[in-house]
Amino acid sequence: MKENKIRKNKEFRHVYRRGKSYSNKLLVLYVCKNRYNINRLGVSVSKKVGKSVVRNKVKRLIKESYRLNLDKDMKRGYDLVFIARNSSNDKDYKDIESALINLLKKAGIYN
């Protein structure tokens, strides 16, 4: 699973600069083609969202909803960076999951 994550600041900056962005009320998605046959995921949650407990909860919800929808007709070969907005701090799993799927469909990655 380590190779499926975007970890370095340089990799995040590359996706921000070269990628295309899509957004809704809860999340922002940056998408950029990569040279691998796998999708790599990065999650960013600002301190504006809340204290560390809240930020980590939002991160876990995003990662889990992505993991559970990974096998369902998703195109491969993209770097995906999800950024949580302030309004995501009090949402539950279903809200985050529907926002995530909505963004993936907007980007044309999820069928």
Curated annotation (Swiss-Prot):
Residues in coiled coil: none
Catalysed reactions, as listed in the record: Endonucleolytic cleavage of RNA, removing 5'-extranucleotides from tRNA precursor
SUPFAM superfamilies: Ribosomal protein S5 domain 2-like
Assigned keywords, A-Z: Endonuclease, Hydrolase, Nuclease, RNA-binding, tRNA processing
Entry keyword annotation includes RNA-binding: yes
One CC-aspect GO term: ribonuclease P complex
Biological process according to GO: tRNA 5'-leader removal
Subunit structure: Consists of a catalytic RNA component (M1 or rnpB) and a protein subunit.
Family: Belongs to the RnpA family.
Role description: RNaseP catalyzes the removal of the 5'-leader sequence from pre-tRNA to produce the mature 5'-terminus. It can also cleave other RNA substrates such as 4.5S RNA. The protein component plays an auxiliary but essential role in vivo by binding to the 5'-leader sequence and broadening the substrate specificity of the ribozyme.
Protein's name according to its UniProt entry: Ribonuclease P protein component
